[in-house]
Amino acid sequence: MKRRELIRLLVGAAAGAWAFPASTQQRPRIGILHSGFPKRTAIHLLFEALGKLGYGDTDIDLLSGEGDPVRLKSLVNQFGARRPVVIIAITTPAAIALKEATLKIPVVFAFVSDPVGLGIVESFAHPSGDFTGVAYSEAGIGGKWLELLVDAIAGMTRVAVLWSASKASIARLESIRTSAATRGIEIFSRKLSGLEDLASAFDDAARAKAQAAIFMTDNTMFGHRKLVAELALTHSLPTIHSFRLEVQDGSLMSYGPTDDEILRRVAALADKILRGARPSELPVEYPTKFELIINLKTAKALGLTIPESFLLRADQVIE
């Protein structure tokens, strides 16, 4: 079965519980571009959201870059030939690749941390051009990560921040520094040059006597989240991350937007475009729903006792 046919069936299955308005118009074609390996649960959430909006019998092309920039560029060119009515770009590299291609096709992006700084849109209120979407989070989330570590780990005075170079990461690092200054927390900052730099970054954090770490995940590191969790455990370093999956794969905790809210809002923006709106007329949105996930098994492996009052704040505790 061809991938497009399979995706159409999945959309229909996800939307099967709802009735869709009859239409004699030609089915619109929707493109979905992911730079890496899309999470099955996330894709299902997106299909479900599109199904609820009436796109249960729509041609959908789901293309995955599988972490290969050359492949990603080739897939963008395929969209140029197929000419979908709208493309949903999942992850920053996917959005950038589409921006650089100048296809003149409306794009709705998801999980992009700094769309203005990256030049994808001119501003949040007035995106301009063919792009709009849902940004991942504001810079202030960095301060929230530090706050959660302070509340979870008694007597903590030194925190490592492991980050990949991007304007979004730099803004979050400044938010962390500001929060740390008010709490008397010392920050050890370590920029990651790439996957080959990961182990040495944890070594440096341990030598700096960090008692915990904030790990700013990029697309490459997210694909190696189990390795990140293993390195953190090896170095006895509690870590906080952005994504639920990082905690499910062994890291201590995460705080970030929920996939379902982001993807529902992305689907809603795509629906508006399919109904005639221009991306430039649709302000870029921020998520409003965040979740705290804690891996208690990892806490025990680290010899860490999480206060009961903190556990009660969690949206999910993995035993």
Language-model-detected regions and their locations in the chain:
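Short hydrophobic alpha-helices and adjacent helix-cap/hinge residues
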Residues: 1-319
